[in-house]
Amino acid sequence: MKVRASVKKICKDCKIIRRKGVIRVICITKRHNQRQG
């Protein structure tokens, strides 16, 4: 899980979701998981 100021989709499997007001990117590739901080 990377914490970034701007989260972007990296590949076609990345999905941007909003959980409890936090924007996250979830993906089957574990390296692509991100959270906005």
UniProtKB/Swiss-Prot annotation:
Record's keyword annotation contains Hydrolase: no
A matching Pfam family: Ribosomal_L36
PROSITE patterns (alphabetical): RIBOSOMAL_L36 (PS00828)
Keywords recorded for this protein, A-Z: Ribonucleoprotein, Ribosomal protein
GO cellular component, one term: ribonucleoprotein complex
Matches recorded under NCBIfam families: rpmJ_bact
Name of the protein in its database record: Large ribosomal subunit protein bL36
Source species of the chain: Desulforapulum autotrophicum (strain ATCC 43914 / DSM 3382 / VKM B-1955 / HRM2) (Desulfobacterium autotrophicum)
Gene this protein is translated from: rpmJ
